[in-house]
Amino acid sequence: MTLQATPLNAIHRALGARMVDFGGWDMPVNYGSQIEEHNAVRSDAGMFDVSHMCVVDLNGANTRAFLRGLLANNVDKLQTPGKALYSCMLDEKGGVIDDLIVYFFAEDRFRLVVNASTALGDIEWIRARNDATGSGVTITPRRGDVAPAGALPLAIVAVQGPNARTKVWNTFPSTQPSDALKPFNAVVVHDPAIGEIMVARTGYTGEDGFELVVPAENVAAVWEKLDAAGVRPAGLGARDTLRLEAGMNLYGQDMDINTSPLDAGLAWTVDLQSERDFTGKAALAAAGQRQQFLGLILRDKGGVLRAHQKVVTAAGDGEITSGTFSPSLSQSIAFARLPMGVAVGDTVQVEIRDRKLAATVVKLPFVRNGKALVS
């Protein structure tokens, strides 16, 4: 199978990146040292090519009403242009089709950023719901492989770390209006060399920073200028350890179409209180929460916490969904779906290679803004 490539593929290879198949995309896992890349994001600034993710623009007078029924979170929270919201998109059974970010720019102009592996299915689902509801929303994917004729393909570079914003401003003075942005807000600026840049104060690392949505034809220039400014290229390996430390779910690993957001630690993104109806609401209300989604820290030596390992508790068995060795904590950490009777602070047993090793149940996240929140 031929892998898809982002517009930065040649640059990754020129930098000596180790490339892997990530959901059908040829992506860099690291550029030599995953731990150094991780630490650069925690202490300074690193950048990630996330152009495999897909921007989807939604336009039309009924866009807000359409999204009110499409998403589990309530887009009525979005009243200020540029404001963003994290949400799940559910099927009728309450399973997670995808988790995404929705941006509001005007009543007839919203933007979604969806995951790479689910993008084609997401677009098909959104179009089907649009047809079924007669909303008349114009749906325009902006990733190169799915953008329609006449739509400028877009790419995304995430610049993350305590010094990320300053380095972006110094490299691209046109982005200075983003200085006033609060987290989960975006602004669109025009750069004379790059063109239109959407600067979003969002990310997937637990650090401050920006996600820059730029014309795909100019993303190489963005990357090279940031590289010259001392922003360290970082791959999927560091991205995974950073997001795990930050307590951020990965679609396909921590939740999927067979998982309720209530069982994946995402109840805070689901609006069950208002009278608004949305796809999957009735199923969620009927099922309720059946499992907890909590963190684990391995206490015994002799293993690393990994996905699918069994967790033995006094309240019954659970399962790890994501696990890794944390560079920031120098400990093995994990997310786990656990029975409702388990409490933070409990000691549980994790089955690792025919051994049972002790782990402590903790509240997520493990690390945020460079500071350990657990011990």
From Swiss-Prot:
Keywords: Aminotransferase, Transferase. One of its GO terms (cellular component) is glycine cleavage complex. Its EC number is 2.1.2.10. Signal peptide: none annotated. One of its GO terms (biological process) is glycine decarboxylation via glycine cleavage system. It comes from the Bacteria. Transmembrane segments: none annotated. One of its GO terms (molecular function) is transaminase activity. It catalyses: N(6)-[(R)-S(8)-aminomethyldihydrolipoyl]-L-lysyl-[protein] + (6S)-5,6,7,8-tetrahydrofolate = N(6)-[(R)-dihydrolipoyl]-L-lysyl-[protein] + (6R)-5,10-methylene-5,6,7,8-tetrahydrofolate + NH4(+). Gene3D superfamilies: Aminomethyltransferase beta-barrel domains (3.30.70.1400), Aminomethyltransferase fragment (4.10.1250.10), Probable tRNA modification gtpase trme, domain 1 (3.30.1360.120). The glycine cleavage system catalyzes the degradation of glycine. Belongs to the GcvT family. NCBIfam families: gcvT, PRK00389.1. The glycine cleavage system is composed of four proteins: P, T, L and H. This is Aminomethyltransferase. It comes from Cupriavidus pinatubonensis (strain JMP 134 / LMG 1197) (Cupriavidus necator (strain JMP 134)).
